[in-house]
């Protein structure tokens, strides 16, 4: 199972990905708005890779796409889709290594995943949320076509404090953005 873009390959995780996964998920800035607390150990990354190996992108539950930079053949991030039991709704999340941010890779990967979700899987609605302080993620979601639908005040207890969450939605009829 592969998705390809101009610069990326999105694929299943492999055992060899565990060290890179542990490294970028251990980064303090990467973990800042995420539910995990660094370090993201190698053992935890290995467990994650094993869990993902048993999942299918078209089945209910979370499936994480490993994002590989084609030119360097290195893991640079991941994009997750949580498909609801009804197979018509999904949630989206993404995490990228610090060295590969700000270069359009996350946007490219998220667009590829959304295209598959809407055109192959026939999902009607994709939802996403991010910490209100995570301006880069909010901008990315809006750039790929999501509509900011709201703000939940003090909705998540994260690392010792209450945080606000921004809520986003994207409907199949709005995909791809700018289509007639």
Name each model feature, range by range.
Residues 1-99, 116, 120, 159-180:
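GNAT-family acyltransferases
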Residues 13, 127-129, 147-163:
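Conserved catalytic-core motifs of GNAT/GCN5-like acyltransferases
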Residues 17-20, 109, 113, 151:
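Hydrophobic alpha-helical segments typical of transmembrane helices
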Residues 81-83, 106-107, 114, 132, ...:
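Short, contiguous, well-ordered secondary-structure segments
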Residues 94-96, 102-119, 135-143:
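Conserved acetyl-CoA-binding loop-helix of GNAT-fold acetyltransferases
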Residues 103, 130, 168:
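Catalytic tyrosine of NAD(P)H-dependent dehydrogenase/reductases that use a Tyr as the general acid/base
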């Amino acid at each position: 199972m592969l998705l390809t873009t101009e610069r990326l390959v999105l694929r299943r995780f492999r055992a060899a990905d565990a060290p890179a996964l542990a490294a970028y998920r251990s980064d303090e800035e990467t973990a800042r708005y995420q539910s995990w607390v660094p370090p993201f150990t190698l053992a935890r990354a290995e467990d994650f890779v094993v869990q993902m190996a048993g999942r299918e992108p078209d089945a209910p539950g979370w499936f994480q796409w490993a994002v590989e930079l084609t030119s360097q053949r290195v893991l640079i991030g991941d994009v997750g889709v949580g498909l609801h039991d009804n197979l018509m709704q999904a949630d989206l999340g993404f995490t990228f290594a610090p060295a590969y941010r700000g270069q359009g890779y996350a946007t490219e990967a998220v667009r590829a995943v959304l295209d598959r979700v809407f055109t192959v899987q026939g999902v009607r609605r994709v939802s996403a949320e991010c910490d209100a302080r995570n301006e880069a993620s909010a901008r990315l979601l809006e750039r790929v076509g999501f509509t900011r639908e709201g703000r939940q005040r003090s909705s998540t207890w994260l690392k010792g404090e209450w945080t606000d969450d921004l809520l986003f939605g994207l409907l199949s009829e709005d995909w791809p953005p700018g289509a007639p």
